[in-house]
From Swiss-Prot:
UniProt biased composition (Gly residues): 26-43
Lipidation (GPI-anchor amidated glycine): 122
Highest taxon of the lineage: Eukaryota
Name this protein carries in UniProt: Shadow of prion protein
Principal location listed in the UniProt entry: membrane
Phylogenetic placement of the source organism: Eukaryota, Metazoa, Chordata, Craniata, Vertebrata
Length: 147
């Protein structure tokens, strides 16, 4: 997962976590008993209770927070180990896997164009502490990162 993808997922999940409606009340709250009328009163009513599912459950919020923290940790681990995603060479540029197919008269179907490795790896490590600091500051403000 590259920086852009990790950042987008972390921000998307943090937004979903922050914009979650907290007005849904769980458990036994609100008007009960005779305040509900004859059918919903405590006397003579069945104990079967139909409750609509909440819009977002607590487990979804926990999963979103965990995924955002995991994405931030993955990005930070990539920075710490120095492993980064390398940019692939474009048309007309010499890449790591150039061979006779890239030369004049070649058919241009070498591994550098069609291999999975060429599209998912790059040539150097990426050092951008600003994104890591932004994510850790955001997650720290949300109290999702605990020392």
């Amino acid at each position: 997962m590259n920086w852009t993808t990790a950042t987008c997922w972390a921000l998307l999940l943090a937004t979903a976590f922050l914009c979650d409606s907290c007005s849904a009340k769980g458990g036994r709250g609100g008007a009960r008993g005779s305040a509900r009328g004859v059918r919903g009163g405590a006397r003579g009513a069945s104990r079967v209770r139909v409750r609509p599912a909440p819009r977002y459950s607590s487990s979804l919020r926990v999963a979103a927070a965990g995924a955002a923290a995991g994405a931030a940790a993955g990005v930070a681990a990539g920075l710490a180990t120095g492993s980064g995603w390398r940019r692939t060479s474009g048309p007309g540029e010499l890449g790591l896997e150039d061979d006779e197919n890239g030369a004049m008269g070649g058919n241009g179907t070498d591994r550098g164009v069609y291999s999975y490795w060429a599209w998912t790896s790059g040539s150097g490590s990426v050092h951008s502490p600003r994104i890591c600091l932004l994510l850790s500051g955001t997650l720290g403000a949300l109290e999702l990162l605990r020392p």
